[in-house]
């Protein structure tokens, strides 16, 4: 059995994979992120994630932070536009302690004002660091333009002015509205029997009252393609070419993921790396990405170059996109691309922690998780015509943002 799944009486779902390892990983994946903020709450989901570590009804902040660290383990969290994830890594024998701590911070955090004052300063520094990184900032600016007017069209970090307004009661209200038990998955991996996992999860999570989300997310409205140049006075030009794409439930997401990997994946033989970097020497770093959300997605190609080379890079990028839109991949080239993609996925799954987090997200969204064999079969079945189709549907009229 690849995965063991279960459901607690309060609606929290669980998924576990038993593997041979002395280390165990677990996570509470919550279907709540920055897109669930009201317009006057931007940055609140991320602040909430930080505030989870600042004290509970049972523990002070230092006790939360030291509970697993003293055991050689780790407690961490992250926020995306759609999810908040609390996760822990410990030795197998300390697994129950990790679960108890996750339950404590997820359901009994008090968000004390004195701790929030200090943590705001930490996030202010995070915002400053982000502003000093044009490669990070341009992606968020591009996404804001691409999803303008929607809940996906704002930065996760928020602004200093907004963060300065938030108090403990704002976080409590946000958690009550968005962190409902029907929107949670407890994911785990380690050398622990499935029924033992379910018993531990029930011990620490099942006494939490069942709650149900009372709102629905709104899909982003269409946005016309755009081209923007912004003066940032950076040492290099930074550029993104991209477009709206399929959401995570769309069956076309898999051929699109393969297409983006061929065009600008991490390998040295991706089309853009070969053309822009290796053949012409115009950019040190150029890559493509595909990020699917629940009801939409984004494909983006980003690079940096000397100011004088930016237009030539754009010309080459557009040429490679046009090639994928007008020429069907040969049988041999498609077979090699699929083999490469499968191998990359297999290597990435060697990380038990990454595998656990991915399984939790997949189970949250799809209520099932494909085995790696099923994923490999789906990739193997892809046809050149499918890639040609998605290239024309997604990349026919890409948008552009340039920092100069």
Q: Residue spans of the language-model regions?
A:
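N- or domain-start disorder-to-order transition segments that initiate the globular core
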Residues: 1-23
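Broad gene-expression machinery/nucleic-acid interaction feature
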Residues: 3, 23-25, 83-85, 183, ...
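Generic preference for hydrophobic
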Residues: 14-16, 28, 186, 241, ...
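Short, conserved beta-strand segments within well-ordered enzyme catalytic domains
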Residues: 15, 25-29, 52, 76-78, ...
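His/Glu-based metal-binding/catalytic segments typifying zinc-dependent metallopeptidases
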Residues: 18-20, 27-29, 212-269, 403
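Active/ligand-binding-proximal structured segments within catalytic/core domains
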Residues: 18-68, 251-264, 271-276
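Charge-rich, well-structured scaffold segments of protease-associated domains
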Residues: 64-213, 219, 229, 246-247, ...
């Amino acid at each position: 059995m690849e995965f063991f799944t279960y459901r607690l009486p309060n609606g929290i779902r669980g998924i576990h994979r038993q593997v041979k390892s002395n280390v165990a990983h677990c996570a509470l994946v919550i279907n709540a992120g920055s897109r669930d903020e009201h317009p006057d709450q931007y940055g609140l989901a991320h602040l909430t994630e930080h505030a989870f570590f600042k004290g509970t009804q049972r523990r002070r902040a230092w006790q939360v932070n030291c509970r697993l660290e003293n055991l050689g383990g780790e407690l961490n969290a992250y926020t995306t536009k759609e999810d908040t994830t609390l996760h822990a890594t410990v030795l197998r024998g300390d697994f129950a302690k990790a679960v108890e701590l996750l339950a404590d911070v997820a359901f009994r955090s008090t968000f004390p004002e004195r701790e929030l004052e200090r943590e705001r300063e930490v996030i202010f520094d995070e915002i400053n660091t982000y502003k000093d990184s044009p490669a990070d900032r341009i992606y968020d600016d591009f996404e804001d333009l691409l999803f303008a007017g929607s809940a996906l069209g704002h930065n996760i970090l928020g602004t200093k002015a907004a963060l300065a307004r938030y108090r403990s009661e704002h976080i409590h209200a946000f958690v009550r509205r968005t962190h409902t038990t029907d929107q949670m998955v407890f994911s785990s991996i380690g050398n622990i029997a499935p029924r033992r996992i379910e018993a531990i999860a029930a011990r620490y999570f099942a006494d939490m009252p069942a709650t149900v989300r009372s709102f629905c997310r709104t899909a982003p409205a269409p946005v016309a393609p755009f081209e923007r140049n912004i003066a940032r006075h950076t040492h290099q030009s930074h550029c993104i070419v991209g477009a709206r794409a399929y959401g995570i439930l769309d069956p076309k997401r898999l051929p699109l993921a393969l297409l983006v990997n061929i065009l600008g994946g991490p390998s040295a033989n991706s089309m853009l790396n070969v053309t822009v970097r290796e053949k012409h020497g115009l950019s040190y770093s150029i890559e493509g990405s595909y990020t699917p959300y629940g009801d939409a997605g984004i494909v983006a190609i980003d690079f940096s170059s000397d100011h004088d080379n930016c237009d030539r890079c754009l010309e080459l990028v557009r040429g490679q996109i046009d090639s994928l839109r007008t020429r069907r991949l040969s049988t041999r080239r498609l077979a090699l691309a699929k083999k490469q993609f499968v191998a990359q996925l297999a290597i990435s799954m060697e990380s038990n922690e990454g595998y656990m987090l991915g399984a939790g997200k997949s189970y949250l969204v799809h209520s099932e998780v494909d085995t790696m064999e099923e994923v490999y079969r789906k990739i193997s079945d892809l046809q050149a015509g499918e890639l040609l189709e998605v290239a024309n549907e997604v990349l026919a009229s890409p948008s552009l943002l340039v920092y100069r």
